[in-house]
Amino acid sequence: METLSNSILTVQIAEHGAELQSIKKDGKEYLWQGNAKFWGRRSPVLFPIVGRVWNNKYRHAGNTYEIGQHGFARDMDFKLTYKEDKGAVYWLESTPDTLGKFPFPFRLLVGYLLEENKITVKWRVENLGAMDMYFQIGAHPAFYFPEFDAATKDRGFFVFDRKSDLEYIMPTEKGCVSPERHVLKLNKEGLMPIDIHTFDCDTYIFDNKQLKKITLLDKKKKPHISLEFNSPLVALWSPTKTHPDCPFVCIEPWYGRCDSVGYSGELKDREWIQKLEPKETFDVEYKIIIESVSYTHLTLPTNR
């Protein structure tokens, strides 16, 4: 376990999965602590796929491969390759075992950098092979609802960087998406209220680059945590449908998503697949912002 700190935040990261374990400010924990009653993870890195492939199988170059939900990186031990007080970098390379599930030699680097009240999470994917590589990558951090009280129905609000209603898709019981598109209507203040029934649909998947920032507000509409990202998709998930007393929500920037129901095509033709030519690299990042440090810089949408 490695610890990063500055004058505002203290962050802990595990080598297993290169996964965030803790985000504290003034001794207060912001990152979900992985109680298995609800969900045993905290902030897994999703690679080399996001979500599920149909029937847990996919096809590439005439062969069929089996891979589980969200890939395997989250369950592997990374190596620490760089460390200072405010930053750390972890790396993972393909092995004979991973090549049996994902037939591409790769290197994955995951970096964390503290700057004031922000944590920048950086990913680099390198294609070490001689053929084009097809992959997806995503984040799955979980955060405590502010001022959580299981005896009440309300959990807070989301505010987005756009004021208009949003389109979303959602997974079926088998974890793959159906073609139906749905509209998320925001309230008169441009907010998405969160209560114990908000996630009866399980997951909201916003695609087509609709969003670049999501902020979780407390019940008084004060900013608590924000995520900034450039990913083409972002998901919101909380298991409150099966666990109404669940105290957390996930905000998940994705470069890819699960299969559509019944998909039987090739890996390279999956929706939102990423492609790397031999020796190319893929570099992206997202930011976690502890907004409760200051409420002065975030402007809520005006009434529409």
Predicted regions and their residues:
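Active-site/ligand-binding surface loops and adjacent short beta/alpha elements
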Residues: 145, 149-230
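Extended, loop-rich substrate-binding clefts of extracytoplasmic carbohydrate-active enzymes
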Residues: 63-116
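Beta-strand-rich interaction surfaces with strong enrichment in secreted/lumenal proteins
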Residues: 109-111, 271-275
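Conserved small/polar residues in nucleotide/adenosyl-binding loops
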Residues: 295-302
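Short Pro-Gly-centered flexible turn/kink motifs
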Residues: 13, 58-66, 123, 274-291
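Acidic-aromatic substrate-binding/catalytic surfaces of carbohydrate-active enzymes
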Residues: 7-64
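Acidic, contiguous internal or C-terminal segments within carbohydrate-active enzymes
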Residues: 4, 96-147
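Acidic/His-leaning functional-site neighborhoods
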Residues: 9, 25, 65, 70, ...
